[in-house]
Amino acid sequence: MELNNADMEHTGEGYMYSTREKQGYGWSHPKRPQEMSENSELGLYYSWAYASAGISYAMKTGDDTYIKQSGMTEGDQKLFKSIALLEETREGKYWEESGNFIYRLGSDHPEKKGEEYSWPYRLQMFHGDFYVRNGEVHEIPENTDGWGKIVYSDGTLKARYLDGAWQMEGFFEGIATNTVGNPFDK
């Protein structure tokens, strides 16, 4: 089962895909679904979908606003900021052709132990055929040392419902911390 952020409402006027010459723009940003505040599997699902959409949006724009609003733990937010080139992306100095993160759920339902839920996933990171850094175009190989056009990573999302919201961690399990958005020209 794919975690489908397409089920969510997005706002924005439409967009232009990134090219080798120009960074994409006009990306629609996720709109927070009401179901996120529910203490239910559906609430957890929509919270995860919102965070997933926020990750892809940040990879394209450098804006991590929706990640901050998503219920992702501070630890996972810090990890993401350390491995993604958000500032360079915001300044138009770095972009990838794609920059999409898609989570595929390992089961139809999360496992619950006490107050903690766990949900296995397979993450597909779509980087595309190229990235641009400081005006220089770099072709992305199929897969080299854990980085390439499409990269897969398995992990388990862990979540608790606290104070009327989902707190989630484990978004980037299994990702080499020096590879996401930080390719070969370090």
Description of each model-found segment:
Residues 1-9, 111-186:
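Exposed beta-sheet edge and beta->alpha loop/turn motif
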Residues 56, 102-103, 174:
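Amphipathic alpha-helical interaction segments
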